[in-house]
Amino acid sequence: MLSPFLAYLLSVVLLCRIARSQYSSDQCSWRGSGLTHEGHTRGVEQVYLRCAQGFLEWLYPTGAIIVNLRPNTLSPAASLLSVCIKPSKESSGTHIYLDRLGKLRLLLSEGDQAEGKVHCFNIQDGALFIEAVPQRDISRKITAFQYELVNHRPGADPQSLSAPCQPCTDAEVLLAVCTSDFVARGRILGVSEEDEQTSVTVSLSHLYRQKTQVFVSGGGRAKRWTGFVKMSRQCGVKPGDGEFLFTGTVRFGEAWLSCAPRYKDFLRVYQDARQQGTNPCHLETD
């Protein structure tokens, strides 16, 4: 028979193990397995992800997990964030719901995940409730997706990666030069329509900044870069003469356009702001 002290110690150890099984996170990404439920197929595990981007991978899903996506720092602006997730095309074995105050709304069925399309929702819409689909054989089932927190321009659709189809104000253009994932000067070579978006082929004479390598150099003495930028189909962009200043964000490895004034118009705005000392950052325009 166990002594009172050993019995107490054993109960503490068991409680710690239960707590670890119910609450887990590594801040940015999470990888887990349904096999850890040890037969409790209706168990629900809490996952907390607090970075701007990361991934989730759930092997052999059983029961359910609740994924809480929140930024590291709390501020009034955080309520304007959208969460975008991109499932792997091999993702299967679960349905994904939005859980707001205990009310579930289907976001992605098991079949929807296989399309690999990006889906966005407002961060205030709740956590993700990911429920395993009952299976006789779970050995080949893996639910996996990437996620990013997106800060949209005012007026943007929180359920889309694209910026609103309206010209940026002078102030928005100047700020975009400082804060965008990519800033470049170039021309539009071609436009192709896709299912829910437009893909624009661009040739760049100046690449001021790119967060990741979405534009590639053509080599040679006359340095030029080429690549693609995405935007909403409703924007109705067409190939045309003249140079533009392209700014935007990189989402899931793709460049999405935000502000794109004609370069001569940007130059006028930038030079005026520079003379008045109101430009928020410097850009080499020579």
Curated annotation (Swiss-Prot):
Gene3D superfamilies for this protein:
2.40.50.120
Gene Ontology CC annotations of this record = extracellular space
> Function, please?
Hormone induced following exercise or cold exposure that promotes energy expenditure. Induced either in the skeletal muscle after exercise or in adipose tissue following cold exposure and is present in the circulation. Able to stimulate energy expenditure associated with the browning of the white fat depots and improves glucose tolerance.
Principal location listed in the UniProt entry: secreted
Q: Give GO terms for biological process.
A: brown fat cell differentiation; energy homeostasis; negative regulation of inflammatory response; positive regulation of brown fat cell differentiation; response to cold; response to muscle activity
* Disulfide bonding pattern of the chain: C28-C51, C84-C120, C165-C235, C168-C259, C178-C281
UniProt keyword list = Disulfide bond, Hormone, Secreted, Signal
Answer yes or no on keyword Disulfide bond: yes
Secretion signal span: 1-21
The record's section on SUPFAM superfamilies has:
TIMP-like
| Molecular-function GO terms, alphabetical | hormone activity
Which positions, given as ranges, span the membrane? none
Family, similarity comment: Belongs to the meteorin family.
InterPro entries referenced in this protein's UniProt entry, alphabetically = Meteorin-like, TIMP-like_OB-fold
Localisation: Secreted
Q: What is this protein called?
A: Meteorin-like protein
